[in-house]
Each structure stands twice: as C-alpha cells, then as structure tokens.
Amino acid sequence: MNELVIGLFAALLGAIVSIFTLYTNYRSSLDSISGWRSKLFDAASAKEITLKEVQVLRTALRYEPTRKVQEYTFAWISNIMIYYCDYISLKYFEHHETSLLYQEQEIIRVFIRCLLKNHWEYNASMVSSLKFLKIHYKASKQPEFIRETYDKAKAISRTLENDDEEYDLIEKINKKMMGSV
C-alpha cells in the first residue's frame, strides 16, 4: 500500500514539474519568436528616437489603458506610457515630423527600459510562472522601479520651458488619469 502511495505521489510530482517546465518554455519561446524584446532593445539604444520607436513602444503595450488602476503599479505606469505615446504620435503626425525633442526621446527611453525591466522581473519570478494555475499572488510592495520610472519621466518633462505645453505633461497625465483634475 505504501509503495502505491509513493508511486502515485512521485507520478503527480513529475506531472506538475513537467507542466511547469512546458509552460515556462512556452512563454520563453513566444518571446523569442516574436522578437519584441529585441525590438525594444533596438529602440531604446537608437541614437535618435523617432516616431518609429514610439510606435514600437506603443505596440508593446496593451491595446487600451486599464480603467481602474492603483498608483505605482505596472498597470498605472503602462497607462501613462500609452497616453504619452498616443500624445506624441498625434503631435508629430499632425505636423508630418518624425524627429522628437531631446526630452521626449529620453522619456521614451525611460519608458522602454521600464517595460523591459518589468518583463524581466515577471519572467524571473517563480510566482508568475504559476499564474496559469490561477494562483494569485499580490506583492505587498510594488516594484520600486515603477516609481523611479515615473519620477525620471516627470523630471525630464520639467526640463522643458514653462510655456511649453509639454511642461509637466507626465504629471498632468497622471492627475487626469487618477481623477485629480
């Protein structure tokens, strides 16, 4: 009887490990097939960020912003990224330009780095690999890099002239999104 229980336990454990490994490999292969991380790296390291790189970032984000978000979460910062990319795209599309201001380029670089960092953290986390089992894990503390990303982008936007419509744009997006305006 003990041998049967031990055998069943070993088989169950083997099945769980196999499923976990298959799931992890599946996620990894999707990343390598699409090459989106590589495209984001290329965009972030480009000498000059143009509308093309803005569209690469926007494409890597969700289709629509999340409706209700909590400050300093990834959903929150990705909403800011979405609104900012859409703003930049419209601004330069209307004027048929592709060259962004230096500050705009740096904000896009910061956003791309944040997206890459979040993806790395997500894939590196053992807990994230168990999401297919519907085991929900809420971190008690949000990753610090999200707050740092917001602070860097906000600081860069404040280097524009006070009369520029983009001065404090990151903060304005946040206030509007969070209902403070």
What are these regions, as identified by a protein language model?
Residues 2, 6, 30-37, 74:
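Amphipathic, non-membrane alpha-helical segments in soluble helical-bundle scaffolds
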Residues 10-11, 15, 43-46, 60, ...:
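A sequence-composition feature that detects small, non-aromatic residues
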Residues 26-67:
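Amphipathic, membrane-active segments
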Residues 65-181:
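An amphipathic alpha-helical interaction surface
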Residues 1-28:
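Membrane-embedded hydrophobic alpha-helical segments
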